[in-house]
Design a protein with these regions (language model features):
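Extracellular adhesion/carbohydrate-binding repeat motifs centered on closely spaced tryptophans
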Residues: 1-59
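Active-site-adjacent pocket scaffolds in enzyme catalytic domains
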Residues: 154, 172-186, 196, 202, ...
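C-terminal domain-boundary segment and adjacent tail
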Residues: 83-84, 96-98, 217-278
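A mature extracytoplasmic/lumenal domain signature
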Residues: 10, 29-31, 51, 68-70, ...
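Active-site beta->alpha N-cap acidic-glycine motif
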Residues: 51-129, 134-140, 144-147, 152, ...
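Ser/Thr/Gly/Pro-rich low-complexity, disordered linker/stalk segments of secreted
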Residues: 260-343
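Alpha-helical scaffold elements lining the catalytic groove of polysaccharide deacetylases
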Residues: 122-149, 162-205, 219-222
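Structural recognition of the beta-strand scaffold that forms the well-ordered cores
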Residues: 63-66, 88-92, 113-118, 153-158, ...
């Protein structure tokens, strides 16, 4: 039970947002007024206990990304993804696809994003390879992904974060760096991984976290500590593309390392990777190195503790009666409670 709104003609607002006497409300498919966070696409809107929309609250978002899989621990990670109903991005190696098709299909089913991390994570950085070889690295992986789950990657990450503008343009997809590096390939300890991430002063709304799902301590950190902690702090965990869309960024064939408000306001979200070719030490198992992202020229992110910041734009709402213009025929009970319901 809950509150609902009856029009003079006996109809009810249902299934969407409605502007009533200058105040915006949200109603579920049964016509009950919604409170708290309400999702509309990839965006979230906050409605007070009286049902009124509060534009001063913005739900902070972070994108968790995992490189070099899929591996033997990926299913454990997906169990947690499913448990908390979150989305993450997997930047996969094509050579690891065969034999783990069901895992990749599960990623897609759970709403995770499929990313391309080349075929075999070549030790030679991409800027030192000819264009045909680079294209083959990404194309072979996409071919394997299509065979495994019926779709190619939507986003890419270069090994060591190193790629030239020409190569990136030829691949023709958005490339993602990161703003917080877990150093999990080096630390190999769940507690240390967690502390490395949470002690990053730039961690906040719009951050992109780099981890690897091929290491057991990394997955243990993510499933037992990091994901629950970020959710407790109020963060919504989304894919990199969802994060971009929520921030009203149209992805291009460019390089992205964060979607902080400071970066958005300064107009420096989309970049080019030609200067980000510093190579890092690679681990013995082929995972990546340690250097931080190319976001060093970006000021640190807001909302370190996951507090809500102000300034969401009320213009996202139309002034119509509801999203789909639908009304109920008034058959619901008229009594109600006053409650609400490695690189």
């Amino acid at each position: 039970t809950g509150k609902w709104y009856q029009n003079p003609d006996g109809t009810y607002y249902v299934n969407g947002f409605a502007d009533i006497d200058g105040t915006t409300y949200s109603f579920d498919k049964k016509g009950y007024m919604q409170t708290g966070w309400v999702e509309k696409g990839v965006k979230d809107y906050y409605f007070n206990e009286d049902g009124s929309y509060d534009p001063s609250k913005k739900r902070p978002m972070i994108a968790l990304t995992f490189d070099d899989g899929p591996g033997e621990y990926t299913e454990t990670l997906l169990d947690t993804v499913e448990k908390y109903n979150i989305h993450v991005t997997f930047f996969m190696l094509g050579q690891n696809v065969e034999g783990r098709e069901s895992t990749i299909q599960r990623m897609v089913k759970l709403g995770c994003e499929i990313g391309n991390h080349t075929w075999d994570h070549p030790e030679q950085t991409l800027p030192n390879m000819d264009l045909d070889s680079v294209m083959q690295e990404f194309q072979k992986t996409d071919d394997a992904l299509v065979k495994a789950c019926g779709q190619a990657s939507t986003v890419c990450r270069a090994p060591y974060g190193a790629i030239t503008d020409e190569q990136m343009s030829a691949v023709g997809k958005p490339f993602f760096m990161w703003s917080t590096d877990s150093l999990d390939w080096k630390l190999m300890d769940a507690d240390a991984d967690y502390n490395q991430i949470m002690n990053d002063s730039s961690l906040g709304d719009g951050s992109i976290i780099l981890m690897h799902d091929i290491h057991e301590p990394s997955v243990k950190c993510a499933t037992e500590k990091l994901i629950p902690a970020l959710i407790d702090q109020g963060y919504k965990l989304v894919t990199v593309s969802e994060l971009a869309e929520a921030k009203d960024v149209t992805l291009q064939s460019a390089s992205y390392s964060d979607f902080w408000d400071s970066s958005l306001q300064a107009g420096r979200v989309a970049g080019y990777a030609g200067n980000s070719s510093d190579s890092e030490d690679s681990s013995e198992d082929g995972s990546d190195g340690s250097d931080s992202s190319d976001g060093s020229d970006v000021s640190d992110g807001s909302s370190d503790e996951g507090d809500y910041s102000d300034g969401s734009d009320e213009s996202d709402y139309s002034d119509g009666s509801s999203d789909d213009g639908s009304y109920d025929d008034g058959s619901y009970d008229e009594s109600y409670d006053d409650g609400s319901e490695e690189y």
